[in-house]
Each structure stands twice: as structure tokens, then as C-alpha cells.
Design a protein with these regions (language model features):
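Conserved serine/cysteine hydrolase catalytic core
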Residues: 207-268, 277
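Conserved hydrolase catalytic core segment
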Residues: 108-151
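Active-site loop/oxyanion-hole signature of alpha/beta-hydrolase fold enzymes
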Residues: 19, 66, 70-113, 295
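Catalytic histidine-centered segment of alpha/beta-hydrolase-like enzymes
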Residues: 281-290, 294
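A catalytic-pocket lid/entrance helix-loop region that shapes and gates access to the active site
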Residues: 139-175
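Conserved HGGG/HGGXW glycine-rich cap/lid loop of the alpha/beta-hydrolase fold
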Residues: 25-80
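Conserved alpha/beta-hydrolase catalytic His-Asp/Glu region
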Residues: 170-230
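The conserved beta1-alpha1 loop
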Residues: 40-44, 115, 251
Length: 309
């Protein structure tokens, strides 16, 4: 059976988690049968839960899956002020709130999985609250060595830009005549050049709203996406060193955001972990190798079961 054609068999439910300052919107699969393994997936900066539908939907036979729209993304309504954004601890705290609700609903610790920024947030949440987390599956998480991070912080402190990713995001066009035009503009180009068209369509579907004038507008404001790239005041090294849960990691051969020494540091935290560089993959590994990512999540769950965790 063709993987890309078989993954749409289950339509996710759209849910809301109310918090004091707004709601976290998330998608949910596999919730109709008790006993499935609880799994939360956190997306990359600028994306949304629906982007990963073709990775996550096939897991619904064995997993109870929740995938959020992070603060400032998708249908989530939590405050997202680019001018006051300094680090990713806000995502850690939001993810802890999601994990607490998921654990309460299922009565079980959950697996946290995430891509890029979502992987980093999952590491920080697991380090802070191992009582909620059974393990981690990381897909090219953003882990920047301290020297490079300090340069970013100094640039931010003195009002300098000097961050090509942030500068590019800030210039991103936010409004198109319709979603179809947006898909045509993105497909096969720029950051989307290695994505199957179906992933671009899902990204646009989950990441836009239709305005009163009929035009399609990005739900993740370019200014917020840019602020995320610049907001490097969190200490991911400290979180890695405080990890006390098992994990697995896939990272890219080309343009990986998981820079040395982090693959080695992570391996020290869990000597049994599978830390695998995927040949031919870029940072957009989930879009390029969706079945591989889904299979890694299944294999990690099997490892936990075999070890009685």
C-alpha cells in the first residue's frame, strides 16, 4: 500500500485546552479506544499540527496522538508578542500544561515527540517534569552550541539582526488571494523545495485563515516566526544535562539544527538511545521521510515496552 495514500484514513478531531490567557488548539487522533500509547507531537517554528498529518495519522492504530498548534501558531490563541519574546521557556511551560492535561486524561505518562523547535521544547519539558514523560522522540531538534547562542543573544541585546533565518521570516509574505495560490507559490520552492505537495497543502490548510475579504492569511505572523529565531535566551545544554528519560533521535545529514556536541551529549544521557543521522535528509526530515519518522516512533515505543518502562 502506498504510504502517502494510506495515511488519511482517520480525520483528526480539533480540541482546545483552556488556559488563563487563552487556549491551546490541538489535533487528536486515536482517542476512540482506551489503552493506546499517549503521544504528543510538537511542530517546528512557523508550522502547525496539520503540517504533520501524514506522519501522525498512521500512528492512530497504536497511539493516542495529540499535536498542538504552539503559541503564536495555527488556531492557538495564547499571547504572542514579538517585542517581548526572549527565549523558548514559554513553549516549555505551555507543553507542560499540555502534558499535565494529557496525563490526567489517560492516567499514564506520555511520549513527547517533536521536530525542530518542537523537539527543543520537548527536551526542556521532559527535563523539567520527568514525572509526566515516558520518553522522547526527537527529529532534528534545534540545539545550538553555547558560543553561537551567545552571539545571537548579544545581537538581540544591542538591537542587531544578523540572523538570516529571522530576517527572511520577517520579510515573508503573509497574505495571498486564496489558499490555492499560496500552495502554488510555495510548492517546490525555497524551504518547501523537498516537500511533497501534500505536505504543503496540509501546512497551508492548518496555518492560514480566510479573511472577510476572501484572502488567505498566515496564522503565524512573520514577526512572531522571526522572533522565535532570535529568541535564544534558553539554555538547552542545561536541559540536556538534566534529562532523565529515555529517548531516540533522528537528525539530518544536510543543514541539521542539532549541532555538535549535542548528538554526543544526548547519547551520554541514554546509552541505549538510537541516535541516527539520516542520509540525504535536510532539516525537513519529517516531510522527506514521513514513514521513517513514524516507524522510529513505533520502534521507540517497542523499546519502552521491552524494558518495562
Amino acid at each position: 500500500m502506498n504510504f502517502m495514500n494510506s495515511v488519511v484514513r482517520e480525520t483528526p478531531a480539533r480540541r482546545q485546552l483552556p488556559l488563563p490567557e487563552g487556549t491551546i488548539s490541538y489535533l487528536e487522533w486515536g482517542y476512540d479506544e482506551p489503552g493506546k500509547t499517549p503521544l504528543h507531537f510538537a511542530h517546528a517554528n512557523g508550522f502547525n499540527a496539520m503540517t504533520y498529518r501524514r506522519v501522525l495519522a498512521p500512528l492512530a492504530d497504536q497511539f493516542h496522538v495529540r499535536a498542538w498548534d504552539a503559541r503564536g501558531h495555527g488556531a492557538t490563541t495564547l499571547t504572542a508578542d514579538p517585542g517581548n519574546h526572549r527565549n523558548w521557556y514559554v513553549y516549555r511551560d505551555d507543553l507542560i500544561a499540555m502534558a499535565e492535561d494529557f496525563v490526567k486524561a489517560t492516567g499514564r505518562k506520555i511520549i513527547l515527540a517533536g521536530h525542530s523547535m518542537g523537539g527543543a521544547a520537548s527536551v526542556m519539558a521532559a527535563a523539567a517534569r520527568p514525572d509526566l514523560v515516558r520518553g522522547l522522540v526527537l527529529v532534528d531538534p534545534v540545539m545550538i552550541p553555547s558560543g553561537a547562542r551567545h552571539v545571537m543573544l548579544l545581537s538581540q541585546l544591542f538591537g542587531l539582526k544578523g540572523n538570516p533565518l529571522a530576517d527572511g521570516a520577517e520579510k515573508r509574505r503573509a497574505v495571498f488571494p486564496d489558499r490555492e495560490t499560496m500552495v502554488e507559490r510555495y510548492a517546490g520552492r525555497g524551504a518547501f523545495r523537498t516537500w511533497p505537495r501534500e505536505f504543503v497543502e496540509d501546512y497551508v490548510q492548518g496555518g492560514t485563515k480566510i479573511r472577510d475579504d476572501g484572502q488567505a492569511e498566515l496564522l503565524c505572523a512573520p514577526a512572531w516566526e522571526a522572533a522565535n529565531f532570535r529568541a535564544q535566551g534558553h539554555n538547552i545544554t542545561k536541559s540536556v544535562r538534566n534529562l532523565h528519560v529515555p529517548f531516540a533521535m533522528l537528525y539530518a545529514e544536510h543543514g541539521s539544527t542539532c549541532r555538535p556536541p549535542f548528538p554526543m551529549l544526548l547519547k551520554r544521557r541514554d546509552p541505549k538511545a538510537q541516535v541516527t543521522q539520516i542520509r540525504g535528509a535536510t532539516h525537513f526530515l519529517p516531510m522527506e521521510f514521513p514513514k521513517l519518522v513514524a516507524d522510529e516512533i513505533r520502534a521507540f515505543r517497542d523499546r519502552l515496552e521491552a524494558e518495562g518502562r
